[in-house]
């Protein structure tokens, strides 16, 4: 019964329609892991009129912010996998917001196909934002962190 096609169809339909990001099916001798992007339950939400007006009035502010952010770069994931902020559970993270990083310094680990891939900084700067959480599934080219480049 566990291996019947109806069971699998129901499992897949439930997974696709729900707000799940990870599913795990355990068998006696093996496990199956299924990953997908987390759905956005607010994607069809309409902002109230006042909020829409406020949003459009901030366009000038956003232009100024973009100008200030020229020295901020995104660190992208080179592969899809599980994001780890430290070398092992319970260990201190490699970096935190405000950490100064140097070229070649390990920022995080992406586990893909049972291989731990260290993601290193290719520039000198300070961590501005960490966009992924420990244990999250990340996709190729997803922003992991933002670094403010050091002014030379």
Swiss-Prot record:
Residues with PTM N6-biotinyllysine: 114
Cysteine disulfide links: none
Record has Plastid as a keyword: yes
Cell location: Plastid, Chloroplast
Keyword terms of this UniProt record: Biotin, Chloroplast, Fatty acid biosynthesis, Fatty acid metabolism, Lipid biosynthesis, Lipid metabolism, Plastid
Pathway: Lipid metabolism; fatty acid biosynthesis
Pfam families: Biotin_lipoyl
Major subcellular location class: plastid
Stored SUPFAM superfamilies: Single hybrid motif
This protein's GO CC annotations: acetyl-CoA carboxylase complex; chloroplast
Domain Biotinyl-binding: 72-148
GO molecular function annotation: acetyl-CoA carboxylase activity
Superkingdom field: Eukaryota
Any one biological process term the GO annotation gives: fatty acid biosynthetic process
Function field: This protein is a component of the acetyl coenzyme A carboxylase complex; first, biotin carboxylase catalyzes the carboxylation of the carrier protein and then the transcarboxylase transfers the carboxyl group to form malonyl-CoA.
Protein name as annotated: Biotin carboxyl carrier protein of acetyl-CoA carboxylase
Source organism of this protein record: Cyanidium caldarium (Red alga)
């Amino acid at each position: 019964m566990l291996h019947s096609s109806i069971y699998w169809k129901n499992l897949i339909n439930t997974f696709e329609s729900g707000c799940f990001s990870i599913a795990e099916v355990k068998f006696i001798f093996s496990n199956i892991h299924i990953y997908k992007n987390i759905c956005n339950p607010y994607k069809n939400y309409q902002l109230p009129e006042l909020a829409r007006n406020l949003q459009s009035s901030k366009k000038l502010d956003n232009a100024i912010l973009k100008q200030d952010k020229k020295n901020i770069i995104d660190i992208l994931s080179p592969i899809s996998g599980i994001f780890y902020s430290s070398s092992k559970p319970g260990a201190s993270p490699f970096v935190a917001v405000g950490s100064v990083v140097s070229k070649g310094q390990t920022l995080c680990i992406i586990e893909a196909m049972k291989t731990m891939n260290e993601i290193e900084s290719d520039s000198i700067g300070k961590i501005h934002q960490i966009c992924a959480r420990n244990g999250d599934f990340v996709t190729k080219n997803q922003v992991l962190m933002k670094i403010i480049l050091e002014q030379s």
